[in-house]
Regions:
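Hydrophobic/aromatic-rich structural module bridging two neighboring secondary-structure elements via a short loop
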Residues: 52-110
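N-terminal ordered "arm"
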Residues: 2-62
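An exposed acidic His-Trp-rich patch
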Residues: 79, 181-187, 241-243
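Alpha-helical rod/repeat scaffolding segments in eukaryotic adaptors/tethers
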Residues: 4, 33, 77-80, 104-107, ...
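Amphipathic alpha-helix face/heptad-repeat signature
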Residues: 7-17, 40-43, 60, 79, ...
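Charged, well-structured binding/catalytic surfaces in domain cores that contact anionic ligands
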Residues: 93-195
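Eukaryote-specific, cytoplasm-facing alpha-helical/coiled-coil scaffolding segments in long proteins
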Residues: 46, 70-74, 115-119
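Extended, charged low-complexity segments
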Residues: 192-244
């Protein structure tokens, strides 16, 4: 099955973007192929561009507390108690995290130079920066992975918070089986509810991909046929509406 996720507000869009960038970083850190370190540095700078914003930390703490209070008001179960404990721990980690506003590399001239070159038209190129080439040649894969892991330590609480919140959101979903012979179908929403995420699941070898447009009253699903031909057979898929 292939799953597509569509945020219904800018806050969830931001959370999804941050989640994906962290996943990209983890994948490249475990990649032994040539130029993976180049991508790791570029991705690390992307992470720092949002992690160094003080408002993100505040927003995450507020959302964590909101979810904790919601769970506290529900019937006590082992699972709910565990989640509340995890949320308390994550909030504490966020509050203690040393996130400094702006790009601050603690006087690390090597990182400052890499950041400058990452913003140049050619990006990070070892030919233009002998010190970077020396670093690549003098470190092993294990050492480079440990280097990046250490750099992410101070902002790991952001990754954990985002991952936990998105897990809670995806688990609080109402799914519907949908079928259409046209390339468009509408699902009506309850305007009194606050919906955060649309999750569309298609077969593993689909002949189309979805896009959506939405408002507080409905989600319009647009199915784009890859071949460009008109659809003759019914398309079946799952439509999930998730909310905090």
């Amino acid at each position: 099955m292939i799953t597509y996720e569509f945020p219904l507000n800018e806050r969830i869009r931001k959370f999804l973007r941050i989640e994906e960038i962290f996943k990209k970083m983890e994948t490249q850190m475990s990649n032994k192929k040539e130029f993976s370190a180049h991508i790791c540095f570029a991705t690390y700078f992307d992470i720092m561009s949002f992690a160094s914003r003080g408002d993100l930390k505040v927003e995450l703490i507020q959302e964590i507390e909101k979810q904790r209070l919601k769970l506290k008001s529900k019937i006590k179960t082992k699972n709910n108690i565990k989640i509340q404990t995890d949320l308390n721990k994550i909030r504490s980690q966020l509050e203690k995290s040393k996130v400094i506003a702006g790009f601050n590399f603690g006087g690390d001239k090597f990182l400052h130079e890499l950041k400058t070159r990452a913003n140049s038209p050619f990006g990070i190129v070892s030919t233009d920066f002998p010190e970077f080439q020396f670093w690549l040649e003098s470190t092993s894969f294990t050492e480079r992975k440990a280097y990046f892991k250490n750099k992410l330590n101070d902002i790991s609480s952001i990754k954990i918070a985002i991952s936990t919140l998105m897990h809670l959101l995806r688990n609080n979903v109402v799914s519907h089986s949908m079928e259409t012979k046209t390339e468009e179908i509408q699902y009506k929403l309850d305007p009194s509810l606050k919906n955060d995420l649309v999750i569309i699941t298609l077969p593993s070898k689909p002949k189309c991909f979805p896009n959506i447009s939405s408002n507080k009253y409905a989600v319009n699903v647009h199915l784009k046929i890859k071949s460009g031909k008109s659809q003759t057979k019914a398309i079946k898929f799952k439509l999930g509406i998730a909310s905090f």
